Amino acid sequence: MHSFASLLAYGLAAGATLASASPIEARDSCTFTTAAAAKAGKAKCSTITLDSIKVPAGTTLDLTGLTSGTKVIFEGTTTFDYEEWAGPLISMSGKDITVTGASGHLINCDGSRWWDGKGTSGKKKPKFFYAHGLDSSSITGLNIKNTPLMAFSVESDDITLTDITINNADGDSLGGHNTDAFDVGNSVGVNIIKPWVHNQDDCLAINSGENIWFTGGTCIGGHGLSIGSVGDRSNNVVKNVTIEHSTVSNSENAVRIKTISGATGSVSEITYSNIVMSGISDYGVVIQQDYEDGKPTGKPTNGVTITDVKLESVTGTVDSKATDIYLLCGSGSCSDWTWDDVKVTGGKKSSACKNYPSVASC
């Protein structure tokens, strides 16, 4: 028979065990109000709510190495103190991560503090969000305003970004530049669904990767839907890309593929489908193989092949001083193209097109 003392001791020990367990259980669902607390406590949480965090200057909101299956919720207004640095402002990695924005939330980067019209030159500006190694994961419903520079840098496998709003409209008059919305590289399986973007650079830029789908996009004020520049990276392959059911307005270009002069690589299995453009200032459709130091040279090379490219139902208007279609390929490097219902009007016809497949028109 147990003595009263031994039962009491057992009860106290059990209570101590429960007491020590309780904080761990409480951390299963965590609300953080500072970047430091989020970084320190993230590994112990299955659900992380980021409530109105003010991120200190020169600091990344560090959500890398999240436990598999973690849910992340942005709530309230997230802000960032000012410092000239490379960023990123937010970085996230892990597997099976679900990221959402609560109703009424805003991630306000207040990019005008950095904007000087010089983009990657001039002041050092932080990139916004690194989704590097954020595999088999999703980001849904984020509302983002005025990124200092590029918004999303995606280097992940099997990631889906849905209903993302990137509103850098203020940059049109306040010096926003190089504010790419989605830069994709070294990724297999990227889905970008129904984004709304107003920016001052590419709405989408794919530098390398495979199995990429972009659909339902609204792209305003930037440089259009781009593949490239391809070349001179560790990975110079872009394969199996579908860009469809999207509008591009008041932008420099609508549809663009560009490769680096003298580089090697490949661009293949590319489809642009049901793209509607308006108010395009430079080129409606542009495919060129002559980029060097970020600028076209007019002298295409053939080291990066562009094959199996399909344009279907690519329509709309460009400005009177713009060029409807410009195709500048290296010798033998552009082949196996399909064009169906490509109707771009309003601008000039180019006399400088070269080496493009006969099914295309220039």
UniProtKB/Swiss-Prot annotation:
Catalytic EC class: hydrolase
Compartment annotation: Secreted
Enzyme Commission (EC) number: 3.2.1.15
Intrachain S-S bonds: C30-C45, C203-C219, C329-C334, C353-C362
Gene3D superfamilies: Single-stranded right-handed beta-helix, Pectin lyase-like
Glycosylated sites: N240
Cross-referenced InterPro entries: Glyco_hydro_28 (IPR000743), Glycosyl_hydrlase_28 (IPR050434), PbH1 (IPR006626), Pectin_lyas_fold (IPR012334), Pectin_lyase_fold/virulence (IPR011050)
Keyword RNA-binding belongs to the record: no
Propeptide residues per the UniProt entry: 21-27
GO cellular component: extracellular region
One Gene Ontology MF term: polygalacturonase activity
Signal sequence interval, chain numbering: 1-20
Lineage: superkingdom: Eukaryota
Reactions that this protein is recorded to catalyse: (1,4-alpha-D-galacturonosyl)n+m + H2O = (1,4-alpha-D-galacturonosyl)n + (1,4-alpha-D-galacturonosyl)m
Swiss-Prot/TrEMBL keywords: Cell wall biogenesis/degradation, Disulfide bond, Glycoprotein, Glycosidase, Hydrolase, Repeat, Secreted, Signal, Zymogen
Active site residues per record: D201 (proton donor), H223
Major localization listed first in the record, in broad terms: secreted
PbH1 repeat residues: 156-186, 209-229, 238-259, 267-289, 301-322
PROSITE patterns for the chain: POLYGALACTURONASE
GO biological process: cell wall organization; pectin catabolic process
Membership in a protein family: Belongs to the glycosyl hydrolase 28 family.
Function comment: Involved in maceration and soft-rotting of plant tissue. Hydrolyzes the 1,4-alpha glycosidic bonds of de-esterified pectate in the smooth region of the plant cell wall.
Protein name: Probable endopolygalacturonase II
Lineage of the species this protein comes from: Eukaryota, Fungi, Dikarya, Ascomycota, Pezizomycotina
